[in-house]
Amino acid sequence: MSDNDEKTVEAQEAGAKPAPKCTDKRKRLGITLVCVVAVLVVAGAGFMVWHEQPNFCNAICHDPMDPYLPTFEATPGEPATDKWGNEVEDAGSMLAAVHNQVGKTCMDCHVPQLDEQMTEGMEWVSGNYDSPLGERTATQLVEARGLENSDEFCMNSSCHPYGRDELEKKTAWMGKINPHTPQHGEQKCTTCHKAHRASVNYCTQCHTDAVVPDSWLSYTDSKL
């Protein structure tokens, strides 16, 4: 074999060697990308699960959420403390505690909306908020979701799947002063039903003989 032939063979062999290296690099890169994507997916899924838990709200927005977590973790039938620091005879009068017992979380009621969360985040960072936060009506609670009917905050397919007519029948046992009979117009659910403090029978503002459910407050007592 001449010198030229030997050089040609060497050149061919030299040119053939990089190909496997390139393939190996691509394989390693592919494996790395798969691992990175897998980690991101798992981390993202874990974050979403944590995001829906009450301790997420408390961990991220430490100060404004501090008064709320105990009302959620309280045990119905036992004394508790409401978000204002008032003693509550029975935590069962606070809907946050009741909802916790059936597996509901903060996000089941307070469905997160990006623009609303951004506004709240800015208020938290700037310190421009009240603590505890002001109480909002059902209308205000569904406003960010674009819902026109505030009843949907409570009466929907995943929570209380019935309308006001059926609701009125469910409380017929309360007699002539049935809080769900619209003799004075339809009231918002949140007028009586409170999540983070003892619920109130608003009817007792005028009807002092109205039935006050166990552990609830009369209108007068709620103002003390």
Predicted feature descriptions by range:
Residues S2-L224:
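Short sequence/structural segments immediately N-terminal
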